Regions:
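Amphipathic alpha-helical packing segments from all-alpha helical-bundle domains
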Residues: 35-38, 57, 84-109, 116-130, ...
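Alpha-helical structural segments
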Residues: 7, 24-47, 53-64, 75, ...
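Short coil/turn helix-boundary motifs
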Residues: 47-51, 69, 111, 139-140, ...
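Amphipathic alpha-helical interface segments
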Residues: 61, 65, 69, 128-135, ...
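Generic C-terminal helix-cap and adjacent flexible tail
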Residues: 159-167
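Short, hydrophobic secondary-structure boundary micro-motifs
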Residues: 74-77, 85, 113, 145, ...
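Helix-turn-helix
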Residues: 1-24, 28
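Amphipathic alpha-helical segments used for helix-helix packing
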Residues: 66-87, 101-105, 134-138
Length: 167
């Protein structure tokens, strides 16, 4: 808050008054980060692209956001209040999973698989990429391109060999 006040050349009480307190300011920050990440992911989930490109672009979109908004991502995954009425990382992942679900259902139909399983696979896929993103937040020994390539390798090669009935 002190940095914001100094940058805006106003006092801290003015900031608190404008946002209704620390919680209001924090909610604005979280909302801004959720919107930035969602915009990047929505652009990557363009259904006019080939499925492998959607996968790679989505992984890179998350990793690029983490790279350029490290503090914002850290707030989303670690510091955001659990009872926040504003957007949250988990609600964002749920929204992304719904978009992925529609893409997978279409692909499942083409592969003669039951599209009723698309919601489950969407959750697994989004969860995998989200967890890798959280890991990469602290472990930057690989470039985002290398990480995305390995995610694509695991997911794509696994998805290509799916069986209609895994039992």
């Amino acid at each position: 808050v002190e940095e914001i006040a100094a940058h805006a050349k106003i006092s801290k009480p003015v900031i608190y008054e404008h946002f209704g307190g620390k919680e209001g300011l924090y909610a604005v920050i979280v909302d801004r980060e959720v919107q930035a990440l969602m915009s990047a992911l929505e652009a990557a989930l363009d259904s006019h692209k080939r499925p492998r490109m959607i996968l790679e672009d989505s992984a890179l979109a998350l990793l690029s956001y983490i790279e350029s908004h490290t503090d914002g991502f850290r707030i989303l995954v670690r510091d955001a209040p659990q009872n926040s009425t504003s957007g949250s990382y988990s609600s964002l992942l749920g929204d992304v999973a719904i978009k992925v679900e529609h893409l997978l259902a279409e692909q499942f139909s083409h592969a003669h698989m039951d599209p009723k399983w698309a919601p489950l696979y969407a959750q697994m896929l989004v969860g995998l990429i989200a967890q890798v993103g959280q890991w990469w937040l602290d472990e930057r020994r690989m470039s985002k391109e290398e990480v995305a390539s390995h995610v694509v390798n695991l997911v794509w090669n696994g998805m290509r060999n799916l069986r209609p009935s895994p039992v």
